[in-house]
Amino acid sequence: MSKVMIFLIKFYQKAISPYLGQGKCKYYPTCSQYALEAFKKKPFFKALGLTIWRILRCNPFSKGGYDPLK
């Protein structure tokens, strides 16, 4: 299942994200890169939870900044 998510994230990064413009994510690494690392390094459900939590935190009220995968 993680391989499917990795494929979908890479597809998003290459086919969709470039058309959204630069600098849309408040975090470093970007939310999609964070998710990609999570699905490569963590069990599926842990990675899914981390990814959802990260996306929920990426909003106009968040200050963003450096937030690496732990």
UniProtKB/Swiss-Prot annotation:
It comes from the Bacteria. Pfam families: YidD (PF01809). It is found in: Cell membrane. It is a peripheral membrane protein. Coiled coil: none annotated. InterPro entries: Membr_insert_effic_factor_YidD (IPR002696). Could be involved in insertion of integral membrane proteins into the membrane. This is Putative membrane protein insertion efficiency factor. It comes from Finegoldia magna (strain ATCC 29328 / DSM 20472 / WAL 2508).
